[in-house]
From Swiss-Prot:
BP GO terms, sorted: microtubule cytoskeleton organization
Binding site for Ca(2+): 140, 142, 144, 146, 151
Pfam families hit by this protein: EF-hand_7 (PF13499)
PROSITE patterns per the UniProt record, alphabetical: EF_HAND_1, EF_HAND_2
Record GO terms (molecular function): calcium ion binding; enzyme regulator activity
Gene3D superfamilies, alphabetized: EF-hand (1.10.238.10)
UniProt name for this protein: EF-hand calcium-binding domain-containing protein 11
Organism encoding this protein: Danio rerio (Zebrafish)
GO cellular component, as recorded: cytoplasm
Length: 167
């Protein structure tokens, strides 16, 4: 089978802020300053970058693809290449859907203020309630007391757009 190395999916471009984050995470996880990531370091890095613990098989694949000859782990350049590839394949809509679903613990298809408060209490326990209320009001575009997925996605997209343009 002949392949060109390109996929038919639309993969997004990685911006400078994301490149810097990958490098920063590498250095934070390489606590012993070995110049490479061990298997455990790599798992922690994936959690920091993508918010989930990779499976054993995913970790094996990352280790196999990132380890170079005469090195016990994954050095910065192969790590950065793997993480950029992984980031560019991420679907922002799916990510927003996952976050929304985590907030929507009652599976109603919308968020109420209590859902919002509860979610923020878990992820940012020191955040003032007033700030959470302001965020809710900002996200509730039609002021009906509910944040639909569309409202939520607009806020997430706005945040991503600002992250991408400010470097």
């Amino acid at each position: 089978m002949l392949t060109t190395g390109r996929s038919f999916r639309n993969e997004r471009q990685i911006n400078d802020a994301e490149r810097k984050k990958i490098e920063l995470v590498f250095h934070q996880c390489d606590v012993d300053k070995k110049g490479y990531m061990s298997r455990e370091d790599l798992k922690i890095a994936v959690v920091m970058l993508f918010g989930y613990k990779p499976s054993k098989s995913e970790t094996n694949i990352l280790m196999e693809n990132g380890t170079i000859r005469d090195c016990k782990g994954v050095p910065l350049e192969p790590f950065a290449t793997l993480m950029r590839r992984k980031m560019s394949a991420e679907d922002p809509y799916e990510k927003a859907r996952q976050i929304f679903s985590a907030f929507d613990v009652h599976c109603r298809g919308f968020l109420k203020l209590d859902d919002f408060k509860s979610a923020f209490k878990r992820v940012a326990p020191r955040l003032q309630e007033r700030t959470v209320l302001e965020a809710f009001r900002h996200a509730d575009q039609d002021s009906d007391g509910h944040i639909s997925f569309k409202d939520f996605e607009n806020i997430i997209s706005y945040g991503l757009a600002n992250t991408c343009t400010s470097t």
